[in-house]
Design a protein with these regions (language model features):
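Acidic-histidine catalytic/liganding microenvironments
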Residues: 4, 8, 91, 125
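Conserved core segment of the aminotransferase class I/II
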Residues: 6-78, 87
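Residue-level recognition of strand-loop junctions within catalytic nucleotide-signaling folds
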Residues: 34-35, 65, 108-110, 149-151
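Conserved glycine-rich beta-strand-loop-beta hairpin in the small C-terminal domain of fold type I
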Residues: 57, 61, 76-85, 96-109, ...
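A short linear hydrophobic-aromatic micro-motif
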Residues: 92-96, 129-134
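PLP-dependent enzyme catalytic core of the Aspartate aminotransferase-like
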Residues: 121-129, 136-173
Length: 173
């Protein structure tokens, strides 16, 4: 939208290394916007959030200078997200679209029941922890967020997804 005529002055674009480069927990990101918006944003961010650690800044700098290191992650996550969609969509009443990138699946379980109950059920029955979509805002009810980046080994990720699938197939409202 910022490239459209007259929109740069009204657009704030936020980039996160956490999701885009797998830097979860390092709290590195940046904003692109016009100066009249940036000045108050910068002052607020420094006062509220503080500064990013030196180690995180160095890691981000290296990542930007050597983008090839991300290729191995892209390949692994591409395989995982395609397999996750295949496994989870095999459950009647469960719907998941292929994530555009990254390691998070947004799973619609609304046809099966309450997402809070289902998340607790999966922890107990499948022994896999998932996030209740309700924690991500009003539109998250009926959804689960599943992280595909927990293990290095693909087979452990796929085994966890299969355990989720098997538990959901047994789930009764």
């Amino acid at each position: 939208p910022a490239a459209l005529p007259g929109m740069f002055e009204r657009t704030v674009t936020v980039f996160s290394f956490s999701k885009g480069m797998g830097f979860s927990g390092l709290r590195v990101g940046y904003i692109v916007c016009c100066d009249s918006i940036m000045d108050p944003l910068f002052a607020t961010a420094v006062a509220v959030v503080g500064a990013t650690s030196t180690a995180a800044q160095q890691a981000a700098t290296v990542a930007l200078q050597h983008p090839g290191f991300m290729k191995q992650f892209e390949t692994a996550y591409d395989k995982r997200r395609h397999r996750a969609v295949e496994i989870l969509n095999s459950v009647p009443g469960v719907h998941v679209m292929l994530p555009e990138s990254g390691f998070l699946c947004w799973v619609d379980v609304s046809e099966l029941g309450d997402s809070t109950e289902i998340a607790a059920y999966l922890t107990a029955e499948a022994r896999v922890s998932v996030n209740d979509g309700k924690n991500y805002g009003q539109g998250g009810a009926g959804h689960l967020r599943i992280v595909l980046g927990v293990y290095r080994d693909d087979e452990r990720v796929f085994a966890a997804l299969e355990a989720v699938r098997d538990a959901l197939l047994r789930y009764k409202k």
